[in-house]
């Protein structure tokens, strides 16, 4: 027998042996084997760094997606020996396209509009938030290396990086979704990603009333407060709906006013025409060039604003915000992390002290009492629902003291058979001190909305 014939027969035997080995794999093992094989061939034949749908516009994205999907389908068709049916092959194609073009196992969650947050706790655990509840998914990364590759895909288009010398970073996806990344040595479980997804459809007041976040009477009162240029502080915990409520309040600002919004990460979407949106700037790779919120607040005062809307007060900018409210820039809006209206006042006092001011605490509280008119307290309840749990008026008293008078509050009564919160919005039977001002301005707001209870 000729040598060429023996080589040919041996190759055929090896192919048959390989086929037999593959057919013994479980469907999941076969999928993993196929993905690894195709991914390796893609690495050998193409420059995958050029393929990133998150750096493309929509038309380029669709063209690239179609091209790459076709390439992968052709490569898979050549692997006829693997025991996968049509649906399984299609699933493998989609997963490979997501890995090659996008953010791997995160892509399907980014496409799902019902998901509000994505949380990656190392390569083996991916959580999602739906309707205010957190769920562990069965998705995972194949390795820490794949997870770090996805992180690089997020950061490299915007000129950011994360490594041991700079192990945490904030970023934003092209669709506006906020991203936080933290890696070892700060994270002890491996790389961690938190993505707060950008919501394409903004909830309006009708949506919030329908969802039971507040009553129509509460909305009407807040609308009047905005028109009267009352300074409003939205207080609440993480994920309690502060930004959503701030968007709603901002929608009540008259069209003919010049509005300056200031945020760490742009989330506010005002519909008015005359809006200037400012965003703080983090330091560059060398740790230089940062422009914090406080500097933007100071600069906004030179921009002839009718209203200043600060996405969130976290530090020394609270002093400049209060001074703006007390010096003619009334009608301003902002949010703060706090668990109650009283706690919000304490937090504001602490933040002003963080600004390095030499003002005594009594003087700071006097500024707060004269600057803040209304506090709206939000909360995320145990069933995942978000509600306005209090609307309170801040009433200045003498010697730096103030009274926090509740006007509306949510009374929780228990849970139903589906473990949903049962409760009612109640009114405290007290008129706001500026009710006469409402009548003088000719605004329609009945005294009755402060008297009778409304069940939901």
What spans do the regions from the language model cover?
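N-terminal anchoring/assembly modules that precede and organize ATP-driven motor systems
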Residues: 1-135
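Active-site phosphate-binding and catalytic loops of NTP-dependent enzymes
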Residues: 51-53, 78-85, 101-112, 154-171, ...
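P-loop NTP-binding catalytic core
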Residues: 112, 120, 125-228
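AAA+ ATPase "lid" subdomain C-terminal helix
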Residues: 180-182, 374-384, 397
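Switch/coupling sub-region of P-loop NTPases
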Residues: 219-235, 244, 248-371, 377-379
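Conserved glycine(s) of the Walker
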Residues: 241
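NTP-binding/hydrolysis catalytic cores, primarily Walker-type P-loop NTPases
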Residues: 384-456
């Amino acid at each position: 027998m000729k040598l060429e014939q023996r080589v040919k027969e041996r190759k055929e035997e090896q192919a048959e042996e390989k086929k037999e080995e593959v057919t013994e794999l479980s469907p999941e093992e076969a999928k993993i084997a196929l993905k690894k094989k195709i991914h390796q061939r893609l690495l050998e034949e193409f420059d995958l760094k050029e393929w990133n749908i998150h750096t493309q516009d929509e038309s380029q994205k669709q063209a690239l997606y179609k091209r790459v999907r076709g390439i992968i389908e052709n490569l898979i068709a050549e692997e006829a020996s693997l025991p996968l049916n049509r649906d399984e092959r299609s699933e493998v194609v989609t997963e490979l396209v997501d890995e090659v073009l996008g953010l791997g196992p995160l892509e399907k969650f980014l496409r799902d509009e019902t998901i509000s947050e994505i949380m990656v706790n190392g390569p083996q655990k991916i959580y999602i938030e739906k309707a205010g509840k957190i769920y562990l998914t069965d998705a995972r990364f194949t390795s820490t290396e794949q997870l770090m590759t996805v992180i690089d895909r997020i950061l490299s288009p915007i000129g950011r990086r994360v490594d041991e010398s700079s192990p945490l970073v904030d970023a934003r996806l092209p669709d506006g979704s906020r991203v936080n990344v933290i890696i070892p040595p700060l994270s002890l479980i491996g790389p961690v990603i938190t993505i707060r997804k950008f919501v394409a459809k903004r909830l309006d007041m009708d949506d919030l009333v329908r969802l039971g976040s507040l009553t129509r009477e509460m909305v009407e009162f807040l609308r009047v407060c905005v028109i009267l240029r009352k300074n409003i502080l939205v207080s609440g915990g993480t994920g309690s709906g502060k930004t959503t409520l701030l968007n709603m309040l901002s929608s009540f600002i008259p069209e003919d006013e010049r509005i300056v919004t200031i945020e760490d990460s742009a989330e506010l979407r005002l519909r008015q025409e005359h809006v200037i949106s400012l965003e703080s700037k983090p330091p560059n790779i060398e740790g230089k060039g940062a422009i914090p919120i406080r500097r933007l607040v100071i600069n906004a005062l030179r921009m002839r604003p009718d209203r200043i809307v600060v996405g969130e007060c976290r530090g020394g900018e609270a002093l400049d915000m209060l001074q703006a409210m007390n010096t003619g820039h009334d009608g301003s809006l902002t949010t703060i992390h706090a668990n109650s209206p009283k706690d919000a006042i304490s937090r504001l006092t602490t933040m002003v002290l963080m600004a390095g001011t030499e003002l005594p605490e009594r003087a700071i509280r006097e500024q707060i009492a004269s600057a803040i008119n209304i506090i709206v307290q939000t909360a995320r309840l145990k069933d995942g629902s978000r509600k306005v749990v209090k609307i309170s008026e801040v009433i200045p008293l003498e010697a730096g003291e103030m009274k926090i008078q509740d006007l509306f509050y949510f009374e929780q009564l228990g849970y139903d058979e589906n473990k949903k919160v049962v409760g009612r919005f109640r009114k405290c039977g007290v008129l706001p001190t500026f009710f006469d001002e409402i009548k003088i301005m000719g605004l329609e707001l009945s005294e009755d909305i402060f008297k009778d209870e409304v069940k939901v």
